[in-house]
Amino acid sequence: MGRHVSGNCPELDRLVDDACAEMGREIAALCIPRLAGVVLGGGYGRGEGGVKEKLEARVGVGETIDKFHSPIPTQNSNSELQLKTPTPTLSNDLDFFAITEDGVPEQETIAAIGEALKPVSEKWTTKLGVDVDFAVKIPWRLKHDEERIMVQELVRGYFDVAGKKGEELFSGIAKIDAAKLPWMEAARLMMNRGMGLLFAMTESKKSWSSELELEKGTVPLSNSNSKLELVRNRDFVNRNINKCILGVGDAFLVSRGLYNWRVEERAAALAAQGDNGLYARAVEWKFRPTEEPVCDLETARETWLDGYMEVIAAVGNDDYSRTFRNAARWLVRRRSIGEIRTFALNPVVRILESVKRHIRDRAAPDDSLMRDWEIFN
């Protein structure tokens, strides 16, 4: 395992090192009020970042499309096709966490720091070719959410970028045994990966329509924007399929008290439980993505629905009980009662139930589900 990427790829480790160093200098020069420090989290922060080999296919004059491993066959006999040697490149977003000082007003500070870091995000997204995101976090909120997988992964694997070191920034957050994560984290994983699957199902329909238009000649074959959009749509669908497979496996392990902080060990734990090997293949795809998905959408859909039943089967009475606190949280933040059938259940459980119905019925997420998920995610 490298500093940032999975496996041996020193050139990408250096790329991320250099980018973080330069971003650190840029952030320091901004002198952003109430900002305590910035770290790189996510896969590249804990040495689990993905690597893809990129071929740049040049179609016609001034038109380029990035592909994995194999060239794009062109249907235009007048087009030129030139390929460069494959080069390793980043395959995932760079997820930075900007930690505020203690005792600051939450919404105002998050908005101000987010706006101040926006030019840095935009500049480096363009330079690196992957999304460079800054999530602004308040210390007390991280402490409040310390039982969440996202927080636990962050405090276990990060790379210092600017300001105070992570050791100081995260000193108040307890490290939790992976096997003792609460069942609600399994529900949250199923909710989020289910939403990603719904987005992929919706996007896949758009891509199919676009390909049909290209075949019919409704869209000119010389329109590189249409081709590039198809490539991006497929990439989006493939990534969410993979995240779904990984998320379902992780949720199962959390619900059974078998979770582990290293993804390779989670794959081994699932293999010991007699899984079909799909999770292990998804791990390989995560580290070395290709243009072919780990499975098709229907397989991902069936896997999610099966996983939902496994996770729900392990729910405890406290997690699936109706309480005044749950009702109050929903009413205050959503300003509506919502479905009577699930009223006063934990908001994550309520949204998970809605996600399940949408996936079961192959329905696109409606405005109500989107709003619920955005508020309680």
Question: PLM features: residue spans?
Answer:
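Low-complexity, highly charged intrinsically disordered N-terminal segments
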Residues: 2-3
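Conserved NTP/Mg2+-binding pocket subregion across the NTase superfamily
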Residues: 7-15, 19, 114-215, 230-256, ...
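Short, polar/flexible loop-turn hinges at active-site or ligand-entry regions and domain interfaces
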Residues: 102-111, 161-165
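Extended charged low-complexity segments that act as oligomerization/scaffolding linkers
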Residues: 119, 281-286
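Terminal (often C-terminal) interaction modules
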Residues: 286-377
